[in-house]
Amino acid sequence: MIIGIDDTDSNEGMCTTYLGALLLEELQEYGNIETLPLLVRLNPTIPYKTRGNAAVALKLKTDCPEKVIAHVTSRIEELARMECEKTNPGAVFIQDKDYGRLRPVLMRFLEEAVRDVIEIKKAKDLISILGIASKGFKNGRGLIGALAACGAMLDQDGLDFTFEHLAYRQKDRWGTPREVDKKSFFEADKETYPETWDTVDLTNRLVVCVPHSADPVLFGIRGESPEIVNKAASLIRAEPVERFAVYRTNQGTDMHLLPAQNIAETRDMHSYRLEGTVSAAPKTLEGGHVIFAVRDREGAEIDCAAFEPTKNFRSLIRKLVPGDLICLSGSVTSGTLNIEKIEIKSLAPVYREENPICPECGKHMKSSGKGQGFRCKKCGTDSPSKVRFEGDRDLDPGLYEVPPCARRHLAKPLVREERRDMRLNPAR
């Protein structure tokens, strides 16, 4: 049996992965856990998400599915933050005998849930048509993520996955400041990077794997294998851990990105790879946000932004000039593309002008007056105009990313990038 669960948390607390970790232990009373649990991040632009827009799935071999359904439903009722308007839990249950029949349709549903916008009605209609056991609470929006997580569990061989070690706090500490030795996170990063990432942000001197909300998570270490995330976690010095779970996840895979042939294809609440030419110089707005325009081959334009939380990434963006050919990865909201990564494919030349140099003495000539050229007062040599030089761009073609402190869950870090046709510039 595959169990998918979503939308049990709120902005004020709880975490669907914590419920998953509890069920990993509790459901062993009814059977055997067959594989690592799954943590599936969905479309990051959805406005009614609580925090990270994540669903979980568990796979269990059991002879008593009805007891499993009853137990899971009871635990959701007990732990979900039902008082929160945005919290609308959902759970679905896929029987072993239905894996083959449901695999293709739920795999497609997963892709849609990560890259598109799905209405609750579509999930409920699909559940009804396919005869899937389910339980929705309130408006049942969590059924969308629950179905998608089941689709991921049915397609483990076909998807790119990473892993996350999630450590959870003792319940009496929830809502209090986390007690962690920040230095130990930098030590763990030094020991395990680049097989782990987004533990710390070296440039901005921040620990980024420790949340600040009131949820049960103490920290989360992301990496390429269960072994490496467990190794990194073992190096952390912090308050006592109630329990931990290692999730297989689509985090750090760029699964949310769609290829856009042109700007006309882009829509709000979707994420894209988009190629174009810088058409207006970057400008810094109030609040520190950096905005510039990109034009595609058809002549359409879109505003692109490196917002203040991207910190030092904005310095790179400010170096762009009209004519630079780039490829952007990011999400479109309110008609503006929020940049996650930028590939600088080619740089436009920039020029500077200087007074001509005297061929006799090697010093710069002085202006003889408006429209009268230039003359060396010492040697008497003259020249009709300034001399034009190609300037240094202080920027190289290559692939760049926002710093770890600003990276979205689904964005693929450059340490995972396998391309060898360009210079990679991982943010640290």
From Swiss-Prot:
Its EC number is 6.3.4.22. Its main location: cytoplasm. Coiled coil: none annotated. Keywords: ATP-binding, Cytoplasm, Ligase, Nucleotide-binding, tRNA processing. It comes from Methanosarcina mazei (strain ATCC BAA-159 / DSM 3647 / Goe1 / Go1 / JCM 11833 / OCM 88) (Methanosarcina frisia). It is found in: Cytoplasm. One of its GO terms (cellular component) is cytoplasm. ATP-dependent agmatine transferase that catalyzes the formation of 2-agmatinylcytidine (agm2C) at the wobble position (C34) of tRNA(Ile2), converting the codon specificity from AUG to AUA. InterPro entries: TiaS-like_TCKD, TiaS_FLD, tRNA_Ile2__agm2C_synt, Zn_ribbon_TiaS. One of its GO terms (molecular function) is ligase activity, forming carbon-nitrogen bonds. It is an enzyme of class 6 (ligase). Gene3D superfamilies: 2.40.50.1010, 3.30.70.2200, 3.90.600.20. It comes from the Archaea. This is tRNA(Ile2) 2-agmatinylcytidine synthetase TiaS. It catalyses: cytidine(34) in tRNA(Ile2) + agmatine + ATP + H2O = 2-agmatinylcytidine(34) in tRNA(Ile2) + AMP + 2 phosphate + 2 H(+). HAMAP family: tRNA_Ile2_agm2C_synt. Belongs to the TiaS family. The keyword tRNA processing applies. One of its GO terms (biological process) is tRNA wobble cytosine modification.
